[in-house]
Amino acid sequence: MKKQDSYIYFVGIDCAQNKHDFAVINDQKKFLIKKGHFSNTLQGYEKFLKTVLSKCLNKDKILFGMEVTGIYGTNLYERLASEGYHVVIISPDSVKKYRDYKGLNKTDKIDSTCIAELLLKGDAQLVDIQKKRIY
């Protein structure tokens, strides 16, 4: 995937059964949120989106990226996509390779920051479910 210049904000999400970890980085490589999390519920989603939108001033300039890990992110993906956000799925292998390259341990918080950085750099192969194409 090549970095898409139309985005300013990159939201990396590591999905799990009960809670999701997330990080937000901007196109200037500054983390706006480095260690966020929210419960895998409607109320958690609403809190998450409110938090993200409080840091990202233009919702049309946000790219959300989620690591593919079973079914835990399905509702989140569908909700974001149905609200018109651009959401892409990244493979766990891409995250692992990047994390290993940086010499980092495996944690959900670290994975969410790695996902955000990969989105910014455009270094991962992503599957865009909305448009059914591979970058």
Residue ranges and their predicted role:
Residues 1-135:
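Phosphate- and other anionic-substrate recognition elements at nucleic-acid/protein interfaces
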